[in-house]
């Protein structure tokens, strides 16, 4: 870490120093005066929250974790593209139940990469009924949403998918499994 030099040095805010908050981007999102769809990807799961600004601290109105997909019978991994998409559908349905129909996407410090898991959550939220301003170019295509790339990789390296088989899912059946879980999530009102 570089030490402060000179009288004009300004110490960055704590969350900026920790690499957690980009305050310039946060201000632009807050000026929209809409709730934020906050998406965070961890090593094990996908987290999506609808967050509203409050002067004393942001308020989480609705929070969903990809582990909640297990309640609907999801047998796949919790942090891949299909799980992110299904998490997006679930957050949209729960937000609509709370009376929130629109939001702006907050990806934090994630790099906005076309077709990434962050945008898979966005696609799920939009298809689930949430209005979020976006460009269709960034959304992942249907084959990635359904997990066809995972099924194709399974054909090349079947020994890497022991966890799927322990949970009772053959990775080649993943696209059909995604469609099945999507149908269950879409009927939530």
Swiss-Prot record:
Keywords: Ribonucleoprotein, Ribosomal protein, RNA-binding, rRNA-binding. The lineage of its organism: Archaea, Methanobacteriati, Methanobacteriota, Archaeoglobi, Archaeoglobales. Belongs to the universal ribosomal protein uL18 family. GO terms for biological process: ribosomal large subunit assembly; translation. Part of the 50S ribosomal subunit. Contacts the 5S and 23S rRNAs. This is one of the proteins that bind and probably mediate the attachment of the 5S RNA into the large ribosomal subunit, where it forms part of the central protuberance. One of its GO terms (molecular function) is 5S rRNA binding. The keyword Ribonucleoprotein applies. GO terms for cellular component: cytosolic large ribosomal subunit. This is Large ribosomal subunit protein uL18. The keyword Ribonucleoprotein applies. The gene is rpl18.
